[in-house]
């Protein structure tokens, strides 16, 4: 019985290590609306959805939006910009821009609806706002760690700015999507098997 119990422990440990070695990409999603804007909600019927996927050091940003009251900023004299991810703050307040400024490269400008996708290397300074790097030790690694921690803690938000709402027309807090529960189910099964072994041993081998 000890050998079987030991084998179960070994299998569990191997599964855990395999999970670390072959970690699934981290996925975060946000539903964007004017009501989510802070400190003042925006009176906008606009809606949007954003997905941020982090696979190793590569981040993929995908977003779609529609129904904005005003067009996304196109670098007009107002100084507003189209879209960013801000870090690090809860949904009740605001934070500085973490991602490239003045906006995500290639984000649709001068429109009330659109879609976007792009990839960023989180080990490059060009993937961040210089001010965010300076605020986190002055290094790209410091910015990377702070940004990832913000994502995983639910302290980042996706914000789309328009000419009518330079502070942001629609916003959504990025929330982590739970990872597959494979290891949890495996762990539950192993625990159940171990309990059955112990019970059988106490019963003297009787079923």
Residue ranges and their predicted role:
Residues 19-23:
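Sec/Tat signal peptide C-region and signal peptidase I cleavage site
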Residues 24-176:
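N-terminal leader/targeting pre-sequences
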């Amino acid at each position: 019985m000890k050998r079987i119990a030991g084998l179960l422990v070994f299998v569990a440990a191997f599964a855990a290590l395999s999970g670390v070695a072959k970690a699934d990409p981290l996925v975060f999603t946000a539903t964007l609306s004017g009501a989510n804007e802070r400190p003042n909600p925006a009176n906008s019927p606009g809606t949007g959805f954003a997905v941020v996927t982090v696979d190793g050091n590569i981040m993929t940003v995908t977003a779609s939006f529609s129904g904005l009251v005003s067009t996304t900023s196109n670098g007009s004299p107002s100084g507003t910009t189209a879209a960013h991810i801000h870090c690090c703050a809860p949904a009740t307040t605001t934070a500085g821009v973490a991602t490239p400024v003045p906006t995500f490269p290639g984000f649709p400008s001068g429109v009330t609806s659109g879609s976007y996708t792009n990839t960023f290397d989180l080990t490059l300074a060009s993937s961040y706002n210089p001010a965010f790097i300076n605020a986190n030790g002055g290094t790209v690694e410091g910015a990377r760690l702070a940004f990832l921690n913000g994502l995983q803690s639910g302290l980042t938000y996706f914000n789309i700015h328009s000419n009518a709402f330079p502070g942001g027309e629609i916003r959504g807090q990025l929330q982590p999507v739970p990872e597959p529960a494979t290891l949890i189910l495996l762990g539950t099964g192993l625990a159940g098997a171990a309990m059955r072994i112990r019970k059988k041993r106490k019963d003297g081998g009787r079923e």
